[in-house]
A protein has these predicted regions:
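Conserved ABC transporter NBD signature motif
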Residues: 72-80
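Short catalytic/signature loops enriched in Gly
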Residues: 3-5, 18-24, 29, 238-323
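Conserved ABC ATPase signature
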Residues: 153-157, 161
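A short, proline-enriched helix->beta-strand linker immediately N-terminal to the Walker B motif
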Residues: 172-176
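Conserved ABC ATPase "signature" region
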Residues: 80, 131-148, 201, 254-258
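P-loop NTP-binding/switch modules centered on Walker-like glycine-rich loops
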Residues: 179, 183-187, 191-269
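Helix-to-loop junction immediately C-terminal to a conserved catalytic motif
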Residues: 64
Length: 323
């Protein structure tokens, strides 16, 4: 019997309309998320990587209905949540949470840690009064913040500590899914591994599922079960972390992996330098979205969008090199 995915999206799209350049001219459209199909199983960590601006964060927010999808469907725990109303969406918030990228702007500077972490308990009618303080103190302890800091304000903490508070806020409702939106990119390198290891430990303790968003493949490699590579609003490759690192299929994935530093000086590898910048999401190229920068592009790549194909068991890509 096949397991029902905890999360499943089908042809999910999020397009943004921009202001008109002239009074009667057409409105440009940003194709931020452009036909995403993913599934996430209970207890799984899915890494989502790609360059800045490729649509990773928009995808995460669309899945959580923090922004409304343009088209496609979102199923969570077997339920279609694409168009559920506000009251039902509020209930779902307890099962789907997010850890934001910037620990400095994501915490309200006017609120104490008690309110930042605990207000969701009150809003969901889960706890009141002293019970909220007890639950928050316990959760802070699990993320490495002493309970004496309950009445402290965000400015009294370091960046790494603030992100731990953000993690506690996401965990306090005991969700099933947490979307980690570049959770360490704003932190010092010396702190990044600590936060990633904390998230891995909490995943085991609370039986969580993560979508781990990052622009750096090395950040998600060691904790993810599978990795999806995103480019210009589309997922262009998906595989287990081991398969992706050992045998990257798409030229863009090959370029990303070539940029990962090798610690062993005897193991040399050729760095693939991509030419130019990614095309504008307001005017994506025809055919394969990567063809303007691809050193292996063929004529068909410029005119036809490649299909999503399974090259090896559970290893998918969209590239004409494999059709």
């Amino acid at each position: 019997m096949n397991q029902i995915p905890l999360l499943q999206t089908k042809d999910l799209k999020k397009h943004f309309l921009l202001e008109r350049r002239t009074m009667f001219g057409p409105r440009d459209r940003v194709y931020a998320v452009d036909g995403i199909n993913i599934d996430l199983n209970l207890g799984e960590i899915l890494g989502l990587v790609g360059e800045s601006g490729c649509g990773k964060s928009t995808l995460g927010r669309t899945i959580l209905r923090l922004i409304e999808p343009t088209a496609g469907t979102i199923h969570f725990n077997g339920q279609d949540i694409t168009h559920v109303k506000r009251a039902e969406l509020k209930k779902l918030r307890s099962k789907m949470q997010i850890v934001f990228q910037d620990p400095y702007s994501s915490l309200n500077p006017r609120l104490t840690v008690l309110h930042i972490v605990g207000d969701a308990l009150k809003a969901q009618g889960i706890a009141q009064g002293s019970e909220i303080a007890d639950r928050v103190a316990d959760m802070l302890n699990k993320v490495g913040i002493h309970k004496e800091k309950l009445r402290a304000f965000p400015h009294e903490f370091s960046g790494g500590q603030r992100q731990r508070i953000g993690i506690a806020r996401a965990l306090i409702l005991q969700p099933k899914l947490i979307i980690c939106d570049e959770p360490v990119s704003a932190l010092d390198v010396s702190i990044q591994a600590q936060v990633i290891n904390l998230l891995a430990d909490l995943k085991t303790e609370f039986h969580l599922s993560y979508i781990m968003i990052a622009h750096d493949l090395s950040v998600v490699n060691h904790v993810s079960n599978r990795i999806a590579v995103m480019y210009l609003g589309k997922i262009i490759e998906l595989a287990t972390n081991r398969a992706l690192l050992a045998n990257p299929l798409h030229p863009y994935t090959q370029a990303l992996i070539s940029a990962i530093p090798v610690l062993d000086p005897d193991k040399k590898k050729k760095r693939i330098i991509l030419k130019g910048e990614p095309p504008s999401p307001t005017n994506p190229p025809g055919g394969c979205p990567f063809h303007p920068r691809c050193w292996r592009a063929m004529g068909i790549c410029k005119t036809d969008v490649p299909q999503w194909v399974e090259i090896e068991p559970n290893h998918y890509t969209m590239c004409y090199l494999y059709e």
